[in-house]
């Protein structure tokens, strides 16, 4: 990577001997400035601003005297590994001997300007696509957004808004709330003085309520696009070339139309995966795409998978009163803190959810109105519903990416994009769940989409920060996390450099009624009370004065508790800051102000008493 930059007519001038590292720092500092787009066949588009290069040199007069003679020749650039991705970037290229740019004053020959139908064409009407489209329009871009929902294996479709609003976050939390309501009545209400004769749940009424709210959100999103001056087309889109998109209006394959765009964003998200090697699975099973609009009540249900989607769905179905079994290959919630994952699973077992550990379906057969499932342990059982939640794959089928030689991870159909949302095609970007190695969370897609739009259309040099992203899992006992798990911290920093503070305790409201285990989970007639319901855990770096790098909470309202803690972690909070903070009593969250037992001490971290996270025993 020597001779990174050469100059016409004055390559020996000492003011222009820029070493490779310093130049790349300049490029990285000002990456994605709208005014200077470097066309590239590399793994990402390099954007930079001549202002910063000009001011790098002490003698500005000598620089400006030959400024018009500059001819940049960048070779073998950016081979350093991207911090977010597990692949490398190569070669920002030349065009006719010059780096191409929109308003390039650094060369004698300006790049030819093209006329496009739109400045920004967005494929995908989920959170990331809509947010990026509206942000771009707010900065004067002409924006077109395509959205089309391909039916699930069971024929389920929905409106604009993507997975989150239609078949993800929104309906999931509503059904979680309905299930939690049922659990409170069934398990605790009598002890608190409530009397009722017949507690019965109406599945159809729940689905009607959920779907009605979703439709109202679909309408508000359409209104939002219109008011933002984003043109919307309900069309199945695919790429023709790096600046051309063809589409079929409302999926009608008999008529193909095309539009051109200066930049194209792919934000098509993911869809649930059903295995091909399980006979009858694709024909007879449903996924999370179907459960929230299921017309008949699910009845006795088998959930296949150990993902957070699997546990959330099995959790609210169990809480609604259905017989639920979960078939898992190995561990649950892979990638999350495993102590917390085990606690979530234990709570679910104590509430009556059955787990088949290391046992998976091998064959599904229709038996009248039920499904006969044959398992890998040679057993079989009848179920009313089988729901697969074993993972998701990028929704890229039909986008024609292969003809453009776009880099894609073929194992999960996700587009390989860097931390700047750039693909290996200069004018094409990817945000949200469809992008490789990006957290599958709606707020992440929204933020990445907005930042990308500002870089393209507002001269911004913002870069998406993927550190300390909070998340919450809406299982019967919720789990919120931000930062590193205990296992990941050990892997990155070494066990000797990590301290883990933790406390296990009982939620106040549950302690008061001595909530009991489901009969399935009772070992004998004396094994009645549930285990401690809550866990508070801080993962800290010893050599940085116990700076907190991991926050984990298992307990009620985990999402609400975790959100504020995420801000603290981003501000580099230390354990002593928690110690010096006064908690709100009696709450579960105050436990984080009272942590003093470490895993390395070997002492018991089970708190005595029953007043939540406070000191009461």
From Swiss-Prot:
It comes from Plasmodium falciparum (isolate 3D7). One of its GO terms (biological process) is cell redox homeostasis. Changing residue 219 to S: 12-fold reduction in affinity for TRX1 and 25-fold decrease in catalytic efficiency. PROSITE patterns: PYRIDINE_REDOX_1 (PS00076). Pfam families: Pyr_redox_2, Pyr_redox_dim. Residues 514-528 are annotated as: Loop important for the interaction with TRX1. This is Thioredoxin reductase. Its cofactor is FAD.
């Amino acid at each position: 990577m020597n001779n990174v930059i050469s100059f016409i007519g004055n390559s020996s001038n000492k003011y222009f001997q820029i070493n490779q590292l310093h130049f790349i720092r300049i490029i990285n500092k000002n990456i994605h400035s709208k005014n200077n787009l470097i066309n590239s066949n590399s793994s990402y588009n390099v954007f930079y601003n001549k202002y910063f290069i000009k001011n790098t040199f002490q003698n500005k007069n000598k620089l400006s005297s030959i400024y018009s003679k500059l001819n940049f020749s960048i070779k073998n650039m950016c081979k350093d590994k991207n911090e977010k991705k597990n692949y490398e970037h190569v070669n920002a290229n030349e065009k006719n001997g010059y780096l191409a740019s929109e308003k390039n004053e650094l060369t004698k020959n300006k790049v030819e300007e093209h006329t496009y139908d739109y400045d920004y064409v967005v494929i995908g009407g989920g959170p990331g696509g809509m947010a990026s489209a509206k942000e771009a329009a707010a900065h004067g871009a002409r924006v077109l957004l395509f959205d089309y929902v391909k039916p699930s294996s069971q024929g389920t479709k929905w409106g604009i808004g993507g997975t989150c609003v239609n078949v993800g976050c929104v309906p999931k939390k509503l059904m979680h709330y309905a299930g939690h309501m049922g659990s409170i009545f069934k398990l605790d209400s009598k002890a608190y003085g409530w009397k009722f004769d017949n507690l019965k749940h109406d599945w159809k009424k729940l689905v009607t309520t959920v779907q009605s709210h979703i439709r109202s959100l679909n309408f508000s999103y359409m209104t939002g696009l219109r008011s933002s001056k984003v043109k919307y087309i309900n069309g199945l889109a695919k790429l023709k070339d790096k600046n051309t998109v063809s589409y079929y209006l409302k999926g009608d394959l008999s008529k193909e139309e095309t539009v051109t765009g200066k930049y194209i964003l792919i934000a098509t998200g993911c869809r649930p995966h059903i295995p091909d090697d399980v006979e009858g699975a694709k024909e007879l099973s449903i996924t999370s795409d179907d459960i929230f609009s299921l017309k008949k009540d699910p009845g006795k249900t088998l959930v296949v998978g150990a993902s957070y989607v699997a546990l959330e769905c099995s959790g609210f179905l169990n809480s609604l009163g259905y017989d639920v079994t979960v078939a898992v290959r190995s561990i649950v919630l892979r990638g999350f803190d495993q102590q917390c994952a085990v606690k979530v699973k234990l709570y679910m077992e104590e509430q009556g959810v059955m787990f088949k550990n290391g046992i998976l379906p091998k064959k599904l057969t229709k038996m009248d109105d039920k499904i006969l499932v044959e398992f890998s342990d040679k057993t079989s059982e009848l179920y009313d519903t089988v729901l697969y939640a074993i993972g998701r794959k990028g929704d890229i089928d039909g986008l024609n990416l292969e003809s453009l030689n776009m880099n894609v991870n073929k194992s999960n159909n996700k587009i390989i994009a860097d931390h700047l949302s750039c693909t290996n095609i200069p004018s094409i970007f990817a945000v949200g769940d469809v992008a490789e190695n990006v957290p599958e969370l709606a707020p992440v897609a929204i933020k990445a989409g907005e930042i990308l739009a500002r870089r393209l259309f507002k001269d911004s040099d913002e870069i998406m920060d993927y550190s300390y992203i909070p998340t919450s899992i809406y299982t019967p006992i919720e789990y919120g996390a931000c930062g590193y798990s205990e296992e990941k911290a050990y892997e990155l920093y070494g066990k000797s450099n990590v301290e883990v503070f933790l406390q296990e305790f009982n939620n106040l409201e549950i302690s008061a009624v001595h909530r009991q285990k489901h009969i399935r989970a009772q070992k004998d007639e004396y094994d009645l009370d549930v285990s401690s319901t809550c866990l508070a855990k801080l993962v800290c770096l010893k050599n940085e004065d116990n700076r907190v790098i991991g926050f984990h909470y298992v307990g009620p309202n985990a999402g609400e508790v975790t959100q504020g803690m995420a801000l603290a972690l981003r501000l580099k909070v230390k354990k002593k800051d928690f110690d010096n903070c006064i908690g709100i009593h009696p709450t579960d969250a105050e436990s984080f102000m009272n942590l003093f037992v470490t895993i390395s001490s070997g002492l018991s971290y089970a708190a005595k008493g029953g007043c939540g996270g406070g000191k009461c025993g």
